[in-house]
Regions:
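A cross-family detector of function-defining hotspots
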Residues: 2-77, 83, 99-155
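Short aromatic-glycine motifs in intrinsically disordered, low-complexity regions
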Residues: 92-98
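Preference for well-ordered, secondary-structure-rich cores of eukaryotic proteins
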Residues: 85-87
Length: 155
């Protein structure tokens, strides 16, 4: 069952899965607002299927990555804790009901039972969005939010 998450996270949720002309313009607008220049990382074609392209727009100074596949925005990664030396923490408030470093229990209390959960490298929970995408919450060892991923469902 899809759940609507309140807050500025929606500016990102509405973009994932789109490949229309305006999606890159909307992403560029966000980049301009964040005030940084992305590092464009093209994935080598020898690792991809025929006629497939994958590109990552890394906004390390803002704690955001955009992952593109064949001109469709496949995923957005928002780093809410300092995970990697080269990345800053996302500074904006993403959620109206809880903080960017809320506990797993706080998030479940606000959003209800997750659609998926597990532990792969770190503990995570997943909610389905109304637009058919997923929002994944990944937690540190103290079960505090460390990264939010909005992505297309894994098939």
């Amino acid at each position: 069952m899809a759940i609507k998450i309140d807050g500025d996270i929606n500016q990102y949720i509405k973009l994932v899965g789109r490949s229309d002309e305006s999606v890159k313009t909307e992403v560029q607008h966000i980049i301009d607002e964040l005030g940084c220049t992305p590092i464009i990382q093209e994935i080598d074609e020898e690792f991809l299927a025929c006629d497939e392209t994958k590109t990552n727009w890394l906004l390390r100074d803002s704690g955001v990555d955009f992952a593109w596949e064949n001109d469709r925005l496949e995923a957005i990664f928002l780093y809410t804790q300092h995970l990697y030396a080269e990345y800053s923490v996302y500074s904006g408030s993403l959620f109206s009901q809880f903080s960017n470093t809320a506990t797993r229990d706080d998030i479940v209390q606000c959003l209800g039972k997750p659609e998926g959960q597990g532990k792969w490298n770190q503990s995570w929970i997943r909610y389905n969005n109304p637009n058919g995408t997923w929002t994944n919450f990944e937690f540190d060892d103290d079960l505090r939010l460390r990264m939010v991923t909005i992505c297309m469902p894994v098939v």
